[in-house]
């Protein structure tokens, strides 16, 4: 498979296509995720993982409670599916970075598994 690039610059690839309910804006979704820094096609340091904590993450899709790349990238997934997201800085943490773990203007790579939609 190959990555699809959206008009915003988000890249995504479904590594596993789910068969359950579809993630839609306005509904809470439950995901497991792992995030890495990503630079010129090379996966860098892991900065966060719900799997490491053993605790899924729940958020309202499209509600602006997460970075824009997640609101856009999780939409349309189906329960049971796994998607890889490559998120440019403008859809991530931008020039401010985050918490000393994510430098300013960082591109991010996430593996997201949709557990509930």
What are the language-model segments listed below?
Residues 1-117:
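Cross-family detector of peptidyl-prolyl cis-trans isomerase
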């Amino acid at each position: 498979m190959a990555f699809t690039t959206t008009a915003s610059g988000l890249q995504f690839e479904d590594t596993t296509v789910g068969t359950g309910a579809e993630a839609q804006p306005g509904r809470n979704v439950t995901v497991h995720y792992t995030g890495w820094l990503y630079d010129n096609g090379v996966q860098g340091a892991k900065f966060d993982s719900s799997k490491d904590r053993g605790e899924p993450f729940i958020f309202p899709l499209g509600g602006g409670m997460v970075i824009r790349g997640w609101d856009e990238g999780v939409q349309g997934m189906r329960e049971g599916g796994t998607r890889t997201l490559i998120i440019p800085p403008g859809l991530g943490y931008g020039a401010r970075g985050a918490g000393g773990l994510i430098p300013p203007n960082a591109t991010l790579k996430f593996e997201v598994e949709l557990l509930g939609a």
